[in-house]
Amino acid sequence: MKHNLILRVIAKYLFPVIALFAFYVQFHGDYGPGGGFQAGVILSVGFILYTLVFGLDTAERVLPSGILRLLASTGILLYAGTGVATMMLGGNFLDYDMLAANPVTGQHIGIILIELGVGITVFAVMLIIFFVIAGRGRT
């Protein structure tokens, strides 16, 4: 599919739309359906589309495996760090009320941080799995 001009043009225009929808799902998850897991899956599927059209080597140059591992661990640290921060502020693990003076604001901040951590981790892990499976048989 690397040499198909129509696919390349469509993929170049479609990826930003997919990414924008993923960010919408990510940040709308606090107020309605959606959240980190769904956004991570949508964003990774957009990048998988890019990989299928432009090739695995090109995709790995754009997003190397070291960056993906860093993103996966950053998401986990964000999730765990939010929980540890709430404990250090005198609450229970992931007791978001402690994150702000107003408990409702604290809930919103906590949920956004947790969902962001989940989204980053899901995005990175799905791409790591895809790259490993897609790269089998290469020498």
Regions found by a protein language model. Give the residues of each.
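Cytoplasmic juxtamembrane interface segments
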Residues: L5, I42-G66
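Short juxtamembrane and helix-loop transition motifs at transmembrane-helix boundaries
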Residues: M1-L7
